[in-house]
Regions:
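Amphipathic alpha-helical segments of tetratricopeptide repeats
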Residues: 28-40, 68-79, 112-122, 159
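Short, small-residue-biased leader/transition segments that mark boundaries at the very start
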Residues: 1-4
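Short, contiguous acidic/charged loop-to-helix segments that flank catalytic cores in large enzymes
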Residues: 41-45, 58, 79-85
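"A position-specific structural signal for the A-helix of alpha-solenoid helical repeats
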Residues: 6-13, 46-56, 60, 88-92, ...
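C-terminal non-catalytic interaction modules
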Residues: 102-206
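Active-site-proximal binding-pocket segments
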Residues: 64-65, 74-77, 83-92, 102-104
Length: 206
């Protein structure tokens, strides 16, 4: 029932938050037959939410083609565009193509997202603009010092995102800023998420 689905999603969410992608992969495998394979029976919004979290686990485990496949159905449903969840899915989809090195797709999708953003000004998110800006950078032949400078140049924007109540609703679903940091410094996403989770826990205990 619904409680079972919510528990499943909540567990996935907490694994992602802590950067525990391997354990999350095992959790998905355990529920493959009982839940994942029956996803088509769920309401559209529930399907989209579950697809997003399952896809993020694949992303964290470096299974980019699986991630792309998992999101492809939802991406085709443009009528959901104004929902924050769908916007998140669309950004994750561009991230996957970034991981796969699909430059042409990224450029065309970034243009398309920018067009949608200019049409839907009331729905625009700073985190979308932040990610689109990052996706325009090329890190080929960029040494560590240059990478660090790029990250420093983004610091103020990062601070603004974390301080904005509306933006943090999106970042709670998935910390896109952590993914950008992982890409810039060429470290595993799980390491950044574990560090962020530990600092959040410290803050919450004070």
């Amino acid at each position: 029932g619904d409680v079972y689905k919510r528990q499943f999603i909540y567990r996935l969410f907490s694994y992602i938050d802590r950067g525990e992608f391997e354990q999350a992969g095992l959790w998905i495998a355990e529920h493959q037959a009982s839940l994942i394979d029956k996803m088509a029976l769920l309401k559209e919004q529930q399907q989209a939410e579950m697809s997003l979290y399952v896809a993020l686990i694949h992303l964290g485990n470096g299974e980019y083609r699986k991630t792309r496949k998992r999101l492809s159905t939802t991406i085709g449903r443009g009528h959901l565009y104004s929902l924050p969840l769908f916007r998140t899915i669309r950004i994750v989809n561009v991230m996957i193509h970034y991981e796969l090195g699909d430059v042409d797709y990224i450029q065309s999708e970034v243009r398309s997202i920018k067009r949608e953003m200019s049409k839907n000004k009331g729905y625009n998110l700073k985190v979308e603009s932040f990610l689109l800006k990052f996706l325009n950078y090329s890190f080929v032949d960029t040494n560590r010092k240059k990478r660090a400078r790029i990250w420093e140049s983004m610091a103020e924007e990062v601070h603004t995102l974390y301080a904005d109540k509306y933006e943090t609703q999106i970042l709670r679903k998935f910390d896109f800023v952590a993914w950008v940091e992982a890409k810039i410094f060429e470290v595993p996403l799980s390491d950044i998420l574990k560090r962020e989770h530990a600092s959040k826990s410290k803050w919450q205990r004070k």
